[in-house]
Amino acid sequence: MKLILLIAIFSALAVVNLGTPSADQVRYNYTELPNGEYCYTPRRRCTSADQCCRPYDTTAAFHGCGRIWPKDKREKVDRCYICNNEKTLCTSVMGK
């Protein structure tokens, strides 16, 4: 009985500590670019980091345009991402 209780407590703590992060945890500023278009949201295809939306808190997070494998895994594509410096949480882990 104690073993079952310990396993349940350990599982609950693991879920709390390792919970699945959502893409909305790193907020970004959706602004208009100098060319009149709006910045690209995370997971959208891009050619340079200047096209991607910047995070609100630039000291705790960074943005960029990087190559990732999409779900179909045919070839790598460039997508916008925003990452949290402290948690290494990125909003573009898998392509959509």
From Swiss-Prot:
GO cellular component terms, semicolon-separated: extracellular region
Function: Moderate insecticidal toxin with probable ion channel impairing activity. In vivo, induces irreversible paralysis in sheep blowflies (L.cuprina), leading to death at moderate doses (9.7 nmol/g).
Tissue-wise expression: Expressed by the venom gland.
Residues forming coiled coils: none
UniProt name for this protein: U4-hexatoxin-Hi1a
InterPro entries recorded: Cys_Knot_tox
Pfam families with a match to the protein in the record: Cys_Knot_tox
Cellular compartments annotated: Secreted
Primary localisation category: secreted
Keywords, ordered alphabetically: Amidation, Disulfide bond, Ion channel impairing toxin, Knottin, Neurotoxin, Secreted, Signal, Toxin
Disulfide cross-links: C39-C53, C39-C80, C52-C65, C83-C90
Superkingdom, natural source: Eukaryota
Signal peptide per UniProt: 1-19
The organism's taxonomic lineage, starting at the top: Eukaryota, Metazoa, Ecdysozoa, Arthropoda, Chelicerata
Species the sequence originates in: Hadronyche infensa
Family in the record: Belongs to the neurotoxin 27 (Jztx-72) family. ICK-72 subfamily.
Residues recorded as bearing Methionine amide in the entry: M94
A GO molecular-function descriptor: ion channel regulator activity
